[in-house]
From Swiss-Prot:
PROSITE patterns per the UniProt record, alphabetical: CYTOCHROME_P450
Keyword Signal set for record: no
Tissues where the protein occurs: Expressed primarily in lung, kidney, and spleen.
Phenotype when the gene is knocked out: Deficient mice are viable, fertile and exhibited no gross abnormalities in size, body weight, and anatomical features of major organs. However deficency causes a mild hemostatic defect and protects mice against arachidonate-induced shock and death.
Lumenal topological segments: 32-75, 245-335
Higher taxonomy: Eukaryota, Metazoa, Chordata, Craniata, Vertebrata
Keyword set, alphabetical order: Endoplasmic reticulum, Fatty acid biosynthesis, Fatty acid metabolism, Heme, Iron, Isomerase, Lipid biosynthesis, Lipid metabolism, Lyase, Membrane, Metal-binding, Monooxygenase, Oxidoreductase, Prostaglandin biosynthesis, Prostaglandin metabolism, Transmembrane, Transmembrane helix
Binding site for heme: 479
Job of this protein: Catalyzes the conversion of prostaglandin H2 (PGH2) to thromboxane A2 (TXA2), a potent inducer of blood vessel constriction and platelet aggregation. Also cleaves PGH2 to 12-hydroxy-heptadecatrienoicacid (12-HHT) and malondialdehyde, which is known to act as a mediator of DNA damage. 12-HHT and malondialdehyde are formed stoichiometrically in the same amounts as TXA2. Additionally, displays dehydratase activity, toward (15S)-hydroperoxy-(5Z,8Z,11Z,13E)-eicosatetraenoate (15(S)-HPETE) producing 15-KETE and 15-HETE.
Cellular component terms (Gene Ontology): cytosol; endoplasmic reticulum membrane
UniProt-recorded name of the protein: Thromboxane-A synthase
Record EC number: 5.3.99.5, 4.2.1.152
Cofactor field: heme
Length: 533
């Protein structure tokens, strides 16, 4: 009897264990797919998701190719799941206009994963709601034409170092990866303009600032951890934020200490002794802390060329005092954002321009004539002179940004339930603006894979459908630093082409292979020859 009782107990225990295991597996299976019915309920086409990770494998080749494939297979309104999070992708101009401009109050915030480094979370890129409005409004004065004119000599100094380095390659006549040179150059620009220090990253790669900049640009989440985060976000995101991360903590500590030391030094200096760099402009904005409301923001007009994006905006309202000055963390955040944009976006844009000019010698020849004429009149270019005398350079930059938009996708979050051109959008939905797909849509851009600066003549711009060209976004949350970024690009190409011409070589990759992790860039560099003029 005792043996029978023991057997019954063991059998009962086994049944309970098996039942619990089956229930757990059933629950896990339900969880793995439970988030993946929302797009279908909204009537939005999308790729079939996989358990837990959604459409993560769809993007294994990078977001650029996958975005173009999404548009081709599912149309200008489609969607996907990244982990359990639903993304609605739009590349239809009228829908984009409603989201970015007409219904901006409901789409004023960008998506945040919760895993961004603190320096990024404290930047104007990811600040939210009222605090974003206050900080952006105060920062607008830092990008006025007068302030940019003060920063132009700092960019020119870094450009002189770049030209000196390029002379060595011109003398050798060997093909080389010019993207590496631009990478070093943009670190020099960022150090000087954003962090108030001077470096020569080409000759001093061991400099702590240079090393930390490169570490920041290669910072990423390991793939196994990313899969876990996407599969179980409510558990893994808070856990990942509190777990120790040596690389993240060292980067935060280095840039925080650097900025705090510079601020302390500036506080001891007289006003006329302080460097007129971006950091000083932010500090000046902090002390005055005047802001404008969102209705008066300096908005990048959609569909315009690079030249029009650099013109002084009209003043639409008077500034008012904000209630809360910048914190030191927010100051660090703005400088770090400049680092991200400079090291990636400017480097890649310069690389793409160089590649296109090297492989289109007729366009380069026309641009060289314009450069020589301009430099004959303006041997020491200033911000204002750069805005009027280089129309073909503006066209070349604009067409490059159409073909290779560095920020080829950006997001907005829906604050409340709404409709966009009849499409229901629930609160919390992430809307993704597919700039890459928009810029390569043959309906708006005939022969989109062809480099043709003539698309950006004054006449062509007037005939273009609005909201089909968005390299800097549009509306109140468009790119705040567009004028500074374009200043760096224009001044660099101007100074380099004044001394050299670009030539394609057998090592030049045609067509150029691309990679698209956070921004769009050349996958294997840009190999060319450079010839002294």
């Amino acid at each position: 009897m005792e043996v029978l009782g023991l057997l019954k107990f063991e059998v009962s225990g086994t049944i309970v264990t098996v039942t619990l295991l089956v229930a757990l597996l059933a629950l896990l299976k339900w969880y793995s797919m439970s988030a993946f019915s929302r797009l279908e309920k909204l009537g939005i086409r999308h790729p079939k998701p996989s358990p837990f990770v959604g459409n993560l494998m769809f993007f294994r080749q990078g977001f650029w190719e996958s975005q173009l494939e999404l548009r081709e297979r599912y149309g200008p309104l489609c969607g996907y799941y990244l982990g359990r999070r639903m993304h609605v992708v739009i590349s239809e101009p009228d829908m984009i206009k409603q989201v970015l401009v007409e219904n901006f109050s409901n789409f004023s915030n960008r998506m945040a994963s919760g895993l961004e480094p603190k320096m990024v979370a404290d930047s104007v890129l990811l600040l939210r709601d009222r605090r974003w409005e206050e900080v952006r409004g105060a920062l607008m004065s830092s990008f006025s034409p007068e302030k940019l004119d003060e920063m132009t000599p700092l960019i020119s100094q870094a450009c002189e170092l770049l030209v000196a380095h390029l002379k060595r390659y011109a003398a050798s006549r060997d093909a080389f990866n010019i993207q590496r040179c631009y990478c070093c150059y943009t670190i020099d620009v960022v150090a000087s303009v954003a962090f108030g220090t001077q470096v020569d990253s080409q000759n001093s790669p061991e400099d702590p600032f240079v090393q930390h900049c490169r570490r920041a640009s290669t910072f990423c989440i390991p793939r196994p951890l990313l899969v876990l985060i996407l599969s179980f976000p409510s558990i893994m995101v808070p856990l990942a934020r509190i777990l120790p991360n040596k690389n993240r903590d060292e980067l935060n500590g280095f840039f925080n200490t650097l900025i705090r030391n510079v601020i302390a030094l500036r506080d001891q200096q007289a006003a006329e002794e302080r460097r007129r760099d971006f950091l000083q402009m932010v500090l000046d904005a902090q002390h005055s802390m005047n802001s404008v409301g969102v209705e008066g923001f300096d908005m990048v007009p959609e569909s315009l060329s690079s030249s029009e994006c650099t013109k002084e905006p009209p003043q639409r309202c008077h500034p008012t005092s904000t209630s809360k000055p910048f914190t030191v963390d927010e100051i660090v955040g703005q400088a770090f954002l400049f680092l991200i944009a400079g090291h990636e976006v400017i480097t890649n844009t310069l690389s793409f321009i160089t590649y296109l000019l090297a492989t289109h010698p007729d366009c380069q020849e026309r641009l060289l004539k314009e450069v020589d004429l301009f430099m004959g009149k303006h041997p020491a270019p200033e911000y204002h002179s750069l805005q009027e005398g280089l129309p073909y350079l503006d066209m070349v930059i604009s067409e490059t940004l159409r073909m290779y938009p560095p920020a080829f996708r950006f997001t907005r979050e829906a604050a409340q339930d709404c409709e966009v051109l009849g499409q229901r959008i629930p609160a919390g939905t992430v809307l993704e603006i597919a700039v890459g797909a928009l810029h390569h849509d043959p309906e708006h851009w005939p022969n989109p894979e062809t480099f043709d600066p003539e698309r950006f003549t004054a006449e062509a711009r007037l005939q273009r459908r609005p909201f089909t060209y968005l390299p800097f976004g549009a509306g109140p949350r468009s790119c705040l630093g567009v004028r500074l970024g374009l200043l760096v690009v224009k001044l660099t190409i101007l100074q380099v082409l004044h001394k050299f011409r670009f030539e394609a070589s057998p090592e030049t990759q045609v067509p150029l292979q691309l990679e698209s992790k956070s921004a769009l860039g050349p996958k294997n560099g840009v190999y060319i020859k450079i010839v002294s003029r």
